[in-house]
Amino acid sequence: MSEPLWRPAPERVAASRMDAFRRFVNQRHGLALADYAALHQWSVSAVADFWQAVADFFAVDFSAPPTRVLENADAMPGAQWFAGAELNFAAHLLRRRDDHPALVAISEDGQREQLSYAELAARVAGLQQHLLALGVQPGDRVAALMPNTWQTVVGMLAAASIGAVWSSCSPDFGAQGVVDRFGQIEPRVLIACSGYRYAGKQLDMSCKLAEILPQLGGLQQLIVVPYGGVQPCLAEFASVVSTVHWDHVSQPAGSPAFTALPFAQPLYILYSSGTTGVPKCIVHGAGGTLLQHLKEHGLHTDLGSEDVLFYFTTCGWMMWNWLVSGLALGATLVLYDGSPFEPASRPLKNVGEAASARQKQAKKRSLHGVNEHSEPVFNAAKATEVGFQRSAAERLIDLIDAENISIFGTSAKYLAALEKAGVEPHRSHQLSRLKAVLSTGSPLAHEGFDYVYRSFKPDLCLSSISGGTDIVSCFALGNPTAPVWRGELQCKGLGMAVEVWDDDGQRLSEGKGELVCSKPFPSMPLGFWKDEDGSRFNAAYFERFPGVWAHGDYAEETPHGGLIIHGRSDAVLNPGGVRIGTAEIYRQVEKVEAVLESLAIGQQWQGDVRVVLFVRLRDGVTLDAALEAEIRQVIRANATPRHVPAKIIAVTDIPRTRSGKIVELAVRNVVHGLPVKNTDALANPEALALFRDLPGLQ
């Protein structure tokens, strides 16, 4: 394509924080960096100067200044950032203390709750006092088995304020999946919900907690949050561990205190997906996470105090940690808990009155008690009048207008589902404040870009972003000062020396290869939990190319300075020795109207590898010879004959992780008769049985 899908207006570029940062760097260092390409090149050449500039531009408050920005700059792993510096992560997320909305929590049934920045700080202070009274100290673990709601954010901030390490799972995890994670890190305190809702079902957590608690050694206290319409029965767990009600430990209590902690103080423990064994416990530091998220939110996403940020996520996915850091920019965060395709049982607000209603109702909707649920601004009769209750597929789109969302984050799979459902938000919604759409979880197909600009609005920055739990951030993401090109991630992140290498470790200026990062960055993990000699950590990222981070993505650079991600390296297909990224096939299959979703693997066959494509079809559609021919023709016409699958098989479900990523490796193992080591990591492990002993693959 010769023209970009979107190009920012000059006034939008000039008003962006990215351009302000470019001018800031030029003035400080006497440079003449003219554009993003020059700024990025400087950021990876003068790495220490760049990260110091980020800290200063965003006014990071060091309780003790660093003696040096970067030590052991050539060591990866081994580089040390901001030695001697002290700060507090939670303090930076709570710098704002006024009545501006900090969190808006919306549940599947339509319940809406709101906390201002002042109220959020007071709630954090209350829980902080309780944790301190328990004797929780820096380095202790506080874990949560919670939905994406305001109580979870309060718990994280209270833990971080005193230097405890936060780790969370969503309540839909199976008991063994939770034990596989929390059992390794031995939390001192567990915050858990009494129940939750999903897809219209009310689910009680009592039995799951009863199974989990005896297996968590060192647990001192369980804090139960009433949620999902399930009233907690504390006596059920009191014989196993001290148990208290959330209401009794989280009442507003003035202003929190913040412990000054080293830059590399552990902040989060996140987990690998765990489909190849017990999940790896990835430890992230406070300072590196803060700097990276300030950069990504403030510069790459152009998030500011006037913005409303939404990302569809659960507390078991790194995007929750990423989302919450938006508080450091003073923005309003919209939290959604539940299915994105479940109609609300309560009406949402009228689109046209959303902005004024939020201001007028701020005090009325603020939270003074856990059981005091705020009512929607509009009643059911009014909602029916304006016709705002629409199809289930539009549930999250409704939030854009109802909450005046300016930055809307979701997944490539969700956007594809909207397109398949025929949803055209520009026809049914105003989207007046929407300035950016973010997509991650899997590569956004070229056609997905077309859909967003055709069916949302033409004047927005569509940012397909890519990184991972491993770095709790991104390697490639958006740029509000640059054009958006079809199918491309706009740019490599500032300060991220991202390159594409061949198998021999040579950089590729064109063509597909391994995505690597050749220089250290602050949000590299501190290591893996209980990996004292660092051997597992080193094997995970630095074994393939010593001294260079190999991320495991199959990618290529573009002439515009961006990237295209073709899938995971370990899922690459290799028929006849030709490497094919699975995303290259998925992109074409999405064009077939009858197919809802697909998954491709390479099957060992007669001394070679053959491509097998599994398809999930629309209701009432069968995979006949005509449909098979159509799928093959679309792939052959738009890719190459090598991409055409040898076998196409219809299945009724496709297994995925709890963050929505399809699991090619697990399916490949099942097809080859190999074990899948940790099915508890999957949202729908029962789907694996669909791929076992298939006659067409024998």
Predicted feature residues:
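AMP-binding/adenylate-forming catalytic core of the ANL superfamily
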Residues: 169, 173-194, 209, 398-401, ...
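Structural core segment of the AMP-binding/adenylate-forming
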Residues: 161-247, 411
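Conserved AMP-binding/adenylation subdomain of ANL enzymes
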Residues: 288-308, 316-406, 421
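Conserved AMP-binding/adenylate-forming core of the ANL superfamily
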Residues: 38-42, 103-157, 174-179, 245-247, ...
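Adenylate-forming
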Residues: 147, 189-208, 229, 338-341, ...
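Conserved AMP-binding/adenylate-forming
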Residues: 299, 401, 435-562, 569-572, ...
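Conserved pre-ATP/AMP-binding loop-to-beta segment of ANL
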Residues: 99-101, 223-224, 238-271, 278, ...
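AMP-binding/adenylate-forming catalytic domain of the ANL superfamily
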Residues: 224, 637-662, 674-698
